[in-house]
Structures are given as structure tokens and as C-alpha cells.
Amino acid sequence: MIQTKDIIELTDTYGANNYHPLPIVISKAEGVWVEDPEGNRYMDLLSAYSAVNQGHRHPKIINALIDQANRVTLTSRAFHSDQLGPWYEKVAKLTNKEMVLPMNTGAEAVETAIKTARRWAYDVKKVEANRAEIIVCEDNFHGRTMGAVSMSSNEEYKRGFGPMLPGIIVIPYGDLEALKAAITPNTAAFILEPIQGEAGINIPPAGFLKEALEVCKKENVLFVADEIQTGLGRTGKVFACDWDNVTPDMYILGKALGGGVFPISCVAANRDILGVFEPGSHGSTFGGNPLACAVSIAALEVLEEEKLTERSLQLGEKLVGQLKEIDNPMITEVRGKGLFIGIELNEPARPYCEQLKAAGLLCKETHENVIRIAPPLVISEEDLEWAFQKIKAVLS
């Protein structure tokens, strides 16, 4: 059997150097546990950046994949499929929106949101041609495509990729007055993460989302929530916006929408917004394919049937409380909602992630000095306690 060092050597030899993974190869996975080629087991505390909320290889989702793969996998959007309509209905009811537009990856859904907002600004709001603006927040992460990179405040993400998309206005995260000042007659949308993931589990001030939505309503600006990481139970609510009782004009969804099995993403909004598209104005050959839709329907059913949102809330509250009790001045803050938790240190976090790997836990540093804790929501209380004891030992 090929070994870890051989796989890493092949990756380093032939792969583009655009990631810096921990030195581990995962060859098997089930639930919250993964295994390397040598048979060493680790607990997954990253969940593929919250794409595996339902756990690795959930039986119901895998069965849906196999069943659909044995019938039809791809039709393109030139034809209807028997899975797309039911999936539309499922997502529309979940988001309480009238229309859904499917894509594949989160970044594609973000690009779709940008196109939607701009066309809405021109066709509905009557902004002068090519003058539409979009407001975003500092330290955001919306993906790696050109529109998403143009919205980033991280200059390293932009280096060598210019020119950037015009009409992007960046404001401090959670700053209501800055939002008010940034809005002009040309503003199409305010796009934000209700909790910033890559920024280190950055939570806005209480009430900010609600107040920001009110400002956007008053100024006729679309309030767009990127719930790719935070949605579908991760924060202890179905959507992180629910913490402020906010329903955005548009949701951007991805990651756990495919149950950690197959990529699928979408934007969801009402007809007065998504209705700006007509045939040929946007699309994707694989977007909304029957295999992805069948998997996604099963993934959403698992979230509901196994009450994973409620589980995330309960276990997350307990874990945050435990982590806050670790006595070490190196820890500057523990913050999170549900099982979306950041441990901020006053020094680089990567060495501690490597120590946690040696202890049998897989997690990843984010924003340089934050350890992100985001296990699959199916994790048992006993397994989470085991993980906490390992974290405590490393950070104490």
C-alpha cells in the first residue's frame, strides 16, 4: 500500500503550491474520525471548513449518492431532471425564499450573488450603467475567484491578479456608521458573512445584523448573507443570521449543502431579485445536476432528522465554556457560536495545530493566530469531551 510520505512526495512534485496542508494523508473517514494509510486514527475538528456538518460518509447521504449514480448523474440544464424540482422546493422552504439558483462551489455562488446584485441595481433600482457598487467588510473571505478576490481586503490574495473588479467598497466589520457612510445611490448590495470564518471566527456586535438590515431596507440596498460556512446548523442555528432574527434579501449557501459528499451551492432570494435573470444570462453545466440534488436533499434531511442544529448549540455552549476555563495567558480569547469556535492566541497557532495532530486531533490555524474548532455536528458528547481533554493538555 502506498504510504503517507509517498503521497506527500507526489503532491509536492506535481501539485501547484497553492495550499500549505498539515503533513497528513487521509485515506479513510467515517463520522468524526479519519484514518491515514498507516492506520493511525484522528478526530476531524475542521469538517472540511464546515462542509462535513453531517459527518464523513453519512449512510443516508451515501445511499442517496449510490442510488442516483445508478440512474442518471448529469443532464445539463438543457433538459429537466427529476431531482432538480424537489431540490428547489426543499431549499426554497428552508430559506423561506421564492427562487433558488444552483451552482457547484461556494465561490461560484458568490459570483452569482454579485451578478444578481448588479443586474438588480440596473434593472430594478435604475442605477446608471456600469456604476453599481457593492459594500463588503474588512477581513472577509468569499472565495478565490476574481469577483471574490476583488472583494477581499487581504492584499496577498490580490497580488499578481489585477486589475480587480471595480465598484467594491470595503468597510470595517460590524461598523454600522461606516455602512451608513458608504452607501450611495449606486449601492447595489451589502455582502457579508454573519460570522467571519477565515478571519478567526469573528462575531459582529450584538444587534449589528438587524441594524444593518434596517439600514439596507431604508436605502434600497440588498442585504446578502454569505452563509456558506456558517449556514446549515454550524453555529447552533439553521443560519447564523438567525442569531439576530434576520432574514437577508439573499442567502449564499454551499459546503454542507452537499453533505461532504458532492459539491453543490446556490443563492436563494425572492422573485423580485432573482427574477432579473432570463435564459442565457447565467448558468452552469453541472449546476443543479441530478446527482448533486439527490445528495443535497438527503443532506438536508439528515440535518433535520438528527436535530444537528440543536446538537451544535448544546455541545458548542458546553465546549466554549470549557475552553474559557483553560488557564494560560497565551490564550487571549475564546469565541464562537455552536460548534464554530475560535481560540485566539498571542502567538502563531500553527505549532499548536501540529501538536494537536500528534495528540490525535486535526484542526487548522486561521488568521495566523487562531485555532479553529469545527467538528462534524454528529460528534458525540463523549468524543467531544475526549477532544477537549487533548486540547487542554496541549494549551496548558
Swiss-Prot record:
The modification N6-(pyridoxal phosphate)lysine is found at residue 255. Keywords: Amino-acid biosynthesis, Aminotransferase, Cytoplasm, Proline biosynthesis, Pyridoxal phosphate, Transferase. Its cofactor is pyridoxal 5'-phosphate. Its main location: cytoplasm. One of its GO terms (cellular component) is cytoplasm. Its EC number is 2.6.1.13. Disulfide bonds: none annotated. The keyword Cell wall biogenesis/degradation does not apply. Catalyzes the interconversion of ornithine to glutamate semialdehyde. NCBIfam families: Orn_aminotrans, PRK04073.1. This is Ornithine aminotransferase.
